[in-house]
Each structure stands twice: as C-alpha cells, then as structure tokens.
Amino acid sequence: MAASFSVPSMIMEEEGRFEAEVAEVQTWWSSERFKLTRRPYTARDVVALRGHLKQGYASNEMAKKLWRTLKSHQANGTASRTFGALDPVQVTMMAKHLDTIYVSGWQCSSTHTSTNEPGPDLADYPYDTVPNKVEHLFFAQQYHDRKQREARMSMSREERTKTPFVDYLKPIIADGDTGFGGTTATVKLCKLFVERGAAGVHIEDQSSVTKKCGHMAGKVLVAVSEHINRLVAARLQFDVMGTETVLVARTDAVAATLIQSNIDARDHQFILGATNPSLRGKSLSSLLAEGMTVGKNGPALQSIEDQWLGSAGLMTFSEAVVQAIKRMNLNENEKNQRLSEWLTHARYENCLSNEQGRVLAAKLGVTDLFWDWDLPRTREGFYRFQGSVAAAVVRGWAFAQIADIIWMETASPDLNECTQFAEGIKSKTPEVMLAYNLSPSFNWDASGMTDQQMVEFIPRIARLGYCWQFITLAGFHADALVVDTFAKDYARRGMLAYVERIQREERTHGVDTLAHQKWSGANYYDRYLKTVQGGISSTAAMGKGVTEEQFKESWTRPGADGMGEGTSLVVAKSRM
C-alpha cells in the first residue's frame, strides 16, 4: 500500500496566498473601472506572472486621476484639450491651464531620442526613447509640486489665500507607436511606461516594420487580430503590475492603402482585388521581379506598376459583385432586388468574410466573377487596402473590447468624418471614449472653417464623444516660432529685443520663469541647506547678492528714445 502524501504547510500557505491574490484581482476587475473591458485571460494567469514582492507605482495614481478626468469630460460632453510637451518648462506652463499632458513620439524622434540621433517619425528610434521623455517630464512635475508645497508652507495663510495653487501633477498620455515589435516587445515597452510615469499609452495598428507618421503616405496596417494581440499584451502587462493605466487604441485605417495580410475576416471587405481577367497569372510582383532581372529600376519599374494598376480594375469584392449584378441580363426590378439583397447583407457592419461573400454572390447568380486579391500584391507582399471611415469603425469595435479610448487618425479636420466615426462606434460600443488628433499637419486655414468655427471645433466634436483632444506637435511648433522670431529680432536689435519680446512679456503675463532662479528651485534647496545646518546657511543660493532681487525693486526706466522722462515701475513678485 502506497504511503499517503502529506502536503507541507509551506505549500498550503503558498497556495492560499496565491488564491487570495486571484480573488483580489477578480474583485478589482469587477469594479466600475473595467466594466467594458473583455480580457481573453484569467486572474490566475495574471497572478501567476507576478512576483512575490508587491510594488506600487506613482503612475497608477495618475492613471486613476486621468480616468476620472476623462470620464467627467465624457459625461459633460466636454473634452480634455492638451498638446505635446517638449520639456519641463512647457509641462509646468501647461499645468496652469490644461488637465492632461501628451508626449509625442514624433517630437521625441525629432528632438530627443535615447541615442541623440534625430530623424522623422518612423518609430526607428530605441524603444526606451518615449518612456525616457515621460520620466523626464514626470520627474519635473513631481519636483515642481514639491517646490510649490515648500513655498506655500513658508507663507502666511493670508499669502496662500492670495497665491493661486497650481496642480503640477497632470496625467501624461504617451505615444507607444506600434508597440515596437512582437508581443514581448510590447509587454516590455508598457512596463517601462508604467515605471517611468505614464498614466496612459496609445498603440496604433500600423505594421511596426513600415511604421509612418499618421500623416505620411505608405502606411501599412496589420490585421485586426494582430493589433488586438498588441492591446491584449499591453492590458496584460498593466494587470500584472496592478495598474489602471489608460489604454488608447489608434487606427490608421482611414488613409492606409496597404495591409500586411488577409488572415482576419474583418479586413476582407476592404481589401482590393483585380477584376481584369486578362491579368490572370500575371501578378504585379512577378512583372516587377522580371523587370529587375533585366536591369530596370526607378522610373522604369514605376511605369510597369502604374500601367498594371491602371489596367487591373481594382475594387473591393462587394464593388465587383455590384458591377456583376448590373451586367446581368435581367429586368430592372430583378436587378434592383438582387442589388438590394446584396447591399443589405454586405453592409460593413456585417463584416462578411470573402468566403461568405462568394457564397451569397453565387445565390444571387454571380457565379463566374473574376476577382483576385493576390494579383495586385506589392513587391513586399502587402495587400491593397481601401481605407475609409467604415474600416476604422470596424476596427474600433474590435479594439474597444480591450482598450479604453479609440482614436481614428484622419487626414483633415472633417466634421462629417468625426460624426460618421462617432456614430458608427457608438452603435455597438456606446460607452467607449473617443480621442481626436487636432493635428498641426492639417493646414487649418485651408480647411474652409471660419475663425469662429475653429473656436467651436473642439467643443463641437466633444459633444460627439471625443473627450480627449490634443495637438500632437504644438510644443515643437511653439518652440520653433518663439526662438526663430526672437533670434531674428535679437540679431537686429540686441538686448532690446530680449527685453521687449521676453522679459517684459513674462512680467506682463505673470510667467514664473521671469524669476528663473526661483522657478528652478533655488529657494527649495536653500531650505535643505538651512535644515541640515540648523536653520542658517552662509552659502544659500538665494541669499544676499542674488541678482533676482532686482525683480522685487522699483526703478526708473528712461523713455523709449532714451532722452525723455522716466517712468517709475514697480515689478510685482513673480508667481510660483
């Protein structure tokens, strides 16, 4: 008789702790925060991926704050409006007026990569580039929050009452591009974002190999299922870390012209095929390969491609079926009935696969249709894709099962597109939040809007559900404009250009960098010195002799021509 096995108490305790943590995760997931989230994994999977040392992340507090902020805007039909911040100066100025912060991959790619090698937004920089910028800004936010607290607690109650409090801890949403590779790359990227301070992350559905800025040509989508895998990887990593990081799913399906594969049936209705039977067996890629073997390149190869595409009769399968029905030798009533039946069943909402479409077409008498989606494939093997708002909506429905916010990248500030997308998304996922890129890549003056319509654009689409809106590169453009115009004037007028354009303007508008020593925290670290040394320090940075005292004094300024009567000015203390 075999001896009975006695489970050691340590094993029982281990299992007990594991099951207790699983129960905690299940309770967490059942909260209001995750009522729309559908995970393809279990709480046991998550806990099994965790270590024994529990860690808390400051970014999680910011994520909860971001969620509250955005849900409040969604409920009120308003929007959190923000823009891409370049540096600590910008992020502290933004804190006085805006309730979220954006970190742009484009700005990082062009101004601040991990290798210091600038370039366009092709997501070819090291994958810690944007997390590093997030940390840069998040550290600055925390520092200025500490600095402000020290300053306020050095004031009397009356002084504090008169001094506006600035919430420097505004949640940061960061650009995760395409996730930077396979599943494990996305997991590690998201881990970095949580550790570095991001409250939210967006991931887009372009191919990571051919990634482009959302307003460049040549964009290649991945299959719906592949992008869902990216989003699941991100959500899983956030769950493993125990954070409520806000996940934004971006789709480039409106302007994309290519897609990596046809593996997902939800993509089928938007893939283009050749309808010219004379091209049977003459694929574009084979013709280009033949041209290259005989030494053709550049314009010659482009000519081959242009001629082939011009003769291919490219269209979607649905469009090809419609054309085939119209060519049938039937009376008009019968044609219209068949067209109506086809168009009803082939609506984009139904996501017919190509196989399902062929079966339905055959029932309607379309049995000899020539339509081939392999013939037009590119040299790289990509399929031709018909981008549209409908394609973006289909993807948005799928992504909304995992992501918290859906963002459709657009080519122009088109209110009709915004409306079509919002109504489409809400027809199946009415509670999901929407985001909109108020892109500086748009020529807003060429949009046809009046100045008043531009003023109304943000609140108008906010009422459609776009509760997070952002100008990706406003920090970059503002920086360039100020420095370019100042440098030009400074070269001509010297110090007067600085005084007129910057110093006096800082004073007029109460910009706290006027007293830049104070802004940088010299007083704050003087407090450290004095605390360490018993309340006094002969080496305090803001002690006697600091030139910043000049900004607290009265002085007489000569007239504009240097000869007239002086004007007595009292400079107010700069804001914190």
Swiss-Prot record:
The answer to whether UniProt assigns keyword Kinase to this entry is no
Swiss-Prot/TrEMBL cofactor(s): Mg(2+)
Classification via InterPro entries:
ICL/PEPM, Isocitrate_lyase, Isocitrate_lyase_ph_CS, Pyrv/PenolPyrv_kinase-like_dom, Pyrv_kinase-like_dom_sf
Q: Which residues form the active site?
A: 213
Q: Where in the cell is it found?
A: Glyoxysome
Biological process terms from the Gene Ontology for this record are: glyoxylate cycle; tricarboxylic acid cycle
Listed GO MF terms: isocitrate lyase activity; metal ion binding
Is Lyase given among the entry's keywords? yes
Q: Which UniProt keywords apply?
A: Glyoxylate bypass, Glyoxysome, Lyase, Magnesium, Metal-binding, Peroxisome, Tricarboxylic acid cycle
Q: What is its EC number?
A: 4.1.3.1
The entry marks the following residues as binding Mg(2+), namely 175
Q: Where does substrate bind?
A: 104-106, 214-215, 250, 437-441, 472
The pathway noted for it is: Carbohydrate metabolism; glyoxylate cycle; (S)-malate from isocitrate: step 1/2
Q: Which GO terms describe its cellular component?
A: glyoxysome
**What is the deletion mutant like?**
No visible phenotype under normal growth conditions, but mutant seedlings fail to establish into plantlets with true leaves under low light or short day conditions.
Its quaternary structure?
Homotetramer.
- Function description: Involved in storage lipid mobilization during the growth of higher plant seedling.
Kindly give the NCBIfam families that the UniProt entry links to this protein.
isocit_lyase
Q: State the name under which the record lists this protein.
A: Isocitrate lyase
